[in-house]
Amino acid sequence: IQPFAMLDMQLYSGKRLDSMKSCELIALPQQMDIKQMAYASVIAEVTEALTEAHEPQEDIYELLVGAVQILSRNNPRLVALSAICKLLVLTGFAPVYDACVNCTEAVEGDAFFSVVQGGLICEACHGGEELPFSSGAQKLLQELIALDFNDPQPFTVRGGDLMQLEQILYRFIVYQIDKPLKSLSFLAQLGL
C-alpha cells in the first residue's frame, strides 16, 4: 500500500492485530519528493499520537486528505505546521494564545509560552523557563489555524517567527504525548 493513499478499507478487529477484508484505492497522492514525504510523516505521527485508535473522526480525516493534497503544491513545512495546528484544535489540545494562562489578561505584543501550562504567558507572569513567543509567531499561529486547504491564500512568513512557532508547537506536543516524535529526527537528518 502506497503511503498517504486514500483507501476504502474493511477491517476486522482481532485480539492483537486487525485484519483487512477488502481494500479499494480511492486516490493516490500527488507524487511527493523526500521533503514532502518527511513532512507528511510528521502530520501522520502527530495525528496518531493525538487521536484514539478505532474512533471514527471525519473532520480529522478531511483535514488529512486536504493536507496531503496540497503538500506537493505548497510549502510542505507550512502545510505540516498548519495541519498540526488544526489537529491540536480538533483534538482539544489547542494551546491558549489570546490571553495569559496565569492571570487571564489579554496579551498584545511579544510574550512567552509555557509548554507545561499549555499557553501564553504575559510579561508580568513570566517566570524565566517559558519560551519566547513573539507577536509575529502568535499571528502566524492564527493564520495557520485559519488556512483553508481548499483555497490557500498567500501570506508572508518571517523565518524567525516560523522557527519559533515550530519550536513551541513541537515541544508542546512532545510534552502532551510524553514521548519524542521520531519523524522530527528524520526531518533533522534531512537538514529540514
Where do the PLM segments sit?
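Non-catalytic alpha-helical scaffolds and adjoining flexible linkers that form interface surfaces
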Residues: I1-L192
